[in-house]
Amino acid sequence: AYPFLVETTVKYELVEGGLTVTHTAVNRSAAKAPYGVGGHPYFKFSADSSDNLIFTSNAKSVLITDERQIPTHKAPLAGTEYDSSMGRRLGDFFVDNDFTDLPRDANGLAHTTLALSPEYLAANAPVENTGLDVWQDANFGHVVFFTPGFYPTPNGRVHTAAIEPATCGPNALNTGDDLLWLKTDELWSGQWGVQLLH
Protein backbone atom coordinates (compact mmCIF):
# COMPACT_ATOMS: atom_id res chain seq x y z
CA ALA A 1 0.00 0.00 0.00
CA TYR A 2 1.01 3.62 -0.51
CA PRO A 3 1.73 4.83 3.05
CA PHE A 4 1.44 8.56 2.35
CA LEU A 5 -1.36 11.11 2.33
CA VAL A 6 -1.20 13.24 -0.81
CA GLU A 7 -4.13 15.54 -1.56
CA THR A 8 -4.68 15.76 -5.32
CA THR A 9 -6.95 17.77 -7.59
CA VAL A 10 -7.53 17.79 -11.34
CA LYS A 11 -9.04 20.82 -13.09
CA TYR A 12 -10.42 20.54 -16.63
CA GLU A 13 -10.83 23.88 -18.39
CA LEU A 14 -12.36 24.37 -21.82
CA VAL A 15 -10.42 27.03 -23.72
CA GLU A 16 -10.76 28.33 -27.26
CA GLY A 17 -10.04 25.40 -29.54
CA GLY A 18 -9.01 23.03 -26.82
CA LEU A 19 -8.77 21.78 -23.25
CA THR A 20 -6.31 22.56 -20.45
CA VAL A 21 -5.79 20.06 -17.62
CA THR A 22 -4.16 21.21 -14.37
CA HIS A 23 -2.97 18.70 -11.77
CA THR A 24 -2.08 19.75 -8.22
CA ALA A 25 -0.75 17.73 -5.32
CA VAL A 26 -0.03 18.61 -1.70
CA ASN A 27 1.80 16.24 0.61
CA ARG A 28 -0.15 16.05 3.88
CA SER A 29 2.17 13.41 5.34
CA ALA A 30 4.78 13.95 8.03
CA ALA A 31 7.51 12.60 5.71
CA LYS A 32 8.57 13.23 2.12
CA ALA A 33 6.24 11.44 -0.29
CA PRO A 34 7.09 9.93 -3.69
CA TYR A 35 4.65 11.06 -6.36
CA GLY A 36 3.94 10.77 -10.06
CA VAL A 37 0.89 11.47 -12.19
CA GLY A 38 -0.29 11.08 -15.76
CA GLY A 39 -3.36 11.38 -17.95
CA HIS A 40 -4.86 8.62 -20.10
CA PRO A 41 -6.96 10.27 -22.84
CA TYR A 42 -8.06 8.29 -25.90
CA PHE A 43 -8.61 10.03 -29.22
CA LYS A 44 -10.69 9.10 -32.27
CA PHE A 45 -11.73 11.34 -35.15
CA SER A 46 -15.23 11.07 -36.58
CA ALA A 47 -14.11 12.41 -39.98
CA ASP A 48 -11.94 9.47 -41.02
CA SER A 49 -10.95 5.96 -39.97
CA SER A 50 -8.54 5.95 -37.05
CA ASP A 51 -6.29 3.66 -39.12
CA ASN A 52 -5.50 6.63 -41.37
CA LEU A 53 -4.56 9.12 -38.66
CA ILE A 54 -0.94 10.30 -38.59
CA PHE A 55 0.93 10.25 -35.27
CA THR A 56 4.02 12.45 -34.87
CA SER A 57 6.39 12.66 -31.91
CA ASN A 58 9.83 14.30 -31.70
CA ALA A 59 10.79 12.41 -28.54
CA LYS A 60 14.44 11.38 -28.48
CA SER A 61 14.18 8.24 -26.32
CA VAL A 62 11.85 5.31 -25.63
CA LEU A 63 11.58 3.00 -22.63
CA ILE A 64 11.92 -0.61 -23.80
CA THR A 65 9.76 -3.06 -21.84
CA ASP A 66 9.77 -6.75 -21.03
CA GLU A 67 6.91 -9.20 -21.56
CA ARG A 68 5.11 -7.75 -18.52
CA GLN A 69 5.32 -4.18 -19.87
CA ILE A 70 7.88 -3.23 -17.22
CA PRO A 71 10.59 -0.90 -18.58
CA THR A 72 14.05 -2.48 -18.69
CA HIS A 73 16.10 0.34 -20.24
CA LYS A 74 16.00 3.60 -22.18
CA ALA A 75 17.05 3.59 -25.84
CA PRO A 76 17.48 6.23 -28.58
CA LEU A 77 14.43 6.53 -30.84
CA ALA A 78 16.01 7.65 -34.11
CA GLY A 79 15.87 5.01 -36.83
CA THR A 80 14.02 2.43 -34.72
CA GLU A 81 10.56 0.90 -35.12
CA TYR A 82 9.33 3.51 -32.61
CA ASP A 83 10.62 6.52 -34.57
CA SER A 84 7.61 8.71 -35.40
CA SER A 85 9.41 11.98 -36.06
CA MET A 86 8.27 11.98 -39.70
CA GLY A 87 4.73 10.83 -38.88
CA ARG A 88 3.35 7.30 -38.74
CA ARG A 89 0.00 5.98 -39.99
CA LEU A 90 -1.88 4.63 -36.98
CA GLY A 91 -3.03 1.47 -38.74
CA ASP A 92 0.52 0.50 -39.71
CA PHE A 93 2.03 -0.07 -36.29
CA PHE A 94 1.33 -1.01 -32.69
CA VAL A 95 3.04 0.64 -29.77
CA ASP A 96 2.52 0.71 -26.01
CA ASN A 97 5.62 2.47 -24.75
CA ASP A 98 6.79 5.48 -22.80
CA PHE A 99 8.59 8.20 -24.78
CA THR A 100 10.91 10.68 -23.04
CA ASP A 101 13.67 13.25 -23.61
CA LEU A 102 11.05 15.48 -25.20
CA PRO A 103 12.12 18.58 -27.17
CA ARG A 104 10.54 21.81 -25.92
CA ASP A 105 9.35 24.96 -27.64
CA ALA A 106 10.12 28.51 -26.50
CA ASN A 107 7.40 28.23 -23.84
CA GLY A 108 8.80 25.00 -22.41
CA LEU A 109 6.07 22.83 -23.91
CA ALA A 110 6.48 19.43 -25.57
CA HIS A 111 4.12 18.44 -28.38
CA THR A 112 2.68 15.20 -29.75
CA THR A 113 0.27 15.42 -32.68
CA LEU A 114 -2.44 13.25 -34.20
CA ALA A 115 -3.67 14.47 -37.57
CA LEU A 116 -5.83 13.62 -40.54
CA SER A 117 -3.91 12.05 -43.41
CA PRO A 118 -2.72 14.12 -46.39
CA GLU A 119 -4.92 11.93 -48.62
CA TYR A 120 -8.02 12.77 -46.58
CA LEU A 121 -7.20 16.48 -46.53
CA ALA A 122 -6.64 16.54 -50.29
CA ALA A 123 -9.91 14.74 -51.01
CA ASN A 124 -12.01 16.81 -48.61
CA ALA A 125 -10.52 20.31 -48.78
CA PRO A 126 -11.08 22.68 -47.21
CA VAL A 127 -10.94 21.09 -43.75
CA GLU A 128 -11.17 23.50 -40.81
CA ASN A 129 -9.66 21.29 -38.10
CA THR A 130 -6.86 19.02 -39.35
CA GLY A 131 -5.86 17.30 -36.12
CA LEU A 132 -4.91 17.83 -32.53
CA ASP A 133 -1.83 18.75 -30.55
CA VAL A 134 -1.32 17.18 -27.12
CA TRP A 135 1.01 19.56 -25.27
CA GLN A 136 2.62 19.20 -21.86
CA ASP A 137 4.60 21.54 -19.66
CA ALA A 138 8.07 20.93 -18.23
CA ASN A 139 6.63 19.06 -15.23
CA PHE A 140 5.57 16.27 -17.60
CA GLY A 141 8.75 14.72 -18.95
CA HIS A 142 7.20 11.57 -20.39
CA VAL A 143 4.39 10.63 -22.76
CA VAL A 144 3.00 7.12 -23.26
CA PHE A 145 1.63 6.30 -26.69
CA PHE A 146 -0.75 3.35 -26.97
CA THR A 147 -2.39 2.22 -30.22
CA PRO A 148 -4.84 -0.61 -29.48
CA GLY A 149 -6.83 -2.11 -32.32
CA PHE A 150 -9.49 -3.42 -29.98
CA TYR A 151 -11.13 -0.30 -28.52
CA PRO A 152 -14.82 -1.17 -27.97
CA THR A 153 -17.51 0.94 -29.67
CA PRO A 154 -21.21 0.33 -30.50
CA ASN A 155 -20.05 -0.57 -34.04
CA GLY A 156 -17.44 -3.07 -32.93
CA ARG A 157 -13.78 -2.82 -32.01
CA VAL A 158 -11.72 -0.13 -33.71
CA HIS A 159 -8.21 1.29 -33.80
CA THR A 160 -7.64 4.26 -31.53
CA ALA A 161 -4.80 6.13 -29.86
CA ALA A 162 -4.05 7.09 -26.29
CA ILE A 163 -1.53 9.92 -25.83
CA GLU A 164 -0.70 10.03 -22.13
CA PRO A 165 1.37 12.89 -20.65
CA ALA A 166 3.15 11.73 -17.49
CA THR A 167 5.64 13.07 -14.97
CA CYS A 168 7.55 9.79 -14.82
CA GLY A 169 7.77 6.47 -16.57
CA PRO A 170 6.03 3.23 -15.58
CA ASN A 171 7.42 1.49 -12.49
CA ALA A 172 8.95 4.73 -11.19
CA LEU A 173 7.98 3.92 -7.59
CA ASN A 174 10.40 0.99 -7.83
CA THR A 175 13.16 2.54 -9.95
CA GLY A 176 12.97 6.12 -8.69
CA ASP A 177 13.51 7.40 -12.24
CA ASP A 178 12.03 10.91 -12.62
CA LEU A 179 9.97 10.37 -9.47
CA LEU A 180 8.82 13.49 -7.64
CA TRP A 181 9.53 13.77 -3.91
CA LEU A 182 7.16 16.16 -2.15
CA LYS A 183 8.12 17.62 1.21
CA THR A 184 5.52 17.94 3.95
CA ASP A 185 2.90 20.52 2.85
CA GLU A 186 4.72 21.09 -0.44
CA LEU A 187 2.43 22.10 -3.32
CA TRP A 188 3.17 20.76 -6.80
CA SER A 189 1.33 21.74 -9.98
CA GLY A 190 1.63 20.78 -13.65
CA GLN A 191 -0.36 21.17 -16.85
CA TRP A 192 -1.04 19.45 -20.12
CA GLY A 193 -3.73 19.96 -22.69
CA VAL A 194 -5.19 19.42 -26.15
CA GLN A 195 -5.39 22.02 -28.90
CA LEU A 196 -7.02 21.74 -32.31
CA LEU A 197 -4.75 22.03 -35.34
CA HIS A 198 -5.89 24.06 -38.34
What annotation goes with each model-predicted range?
Residues A1, S50, N58-P71, E164-G176, ...:
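Surface-exposed, gly/pro-biased binding rims or lids
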Residues A1-E16:
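Extended, loop-rich substrate-binding clefts of extracytoplasmic carbohydrate-active enzymes
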Residues T8, L19-V21, W188:
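Hydrophobic core residues within well-ordered beta-strands of beta-rich domains
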Residues T9-K11, D101, D177-L182:
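Beta-strand-rich interaction surfaces with strong enrichment in secreted/lumenal proteins
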Residues A31-V37:
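Short, hydrophobic/aromatic beta-strand segments
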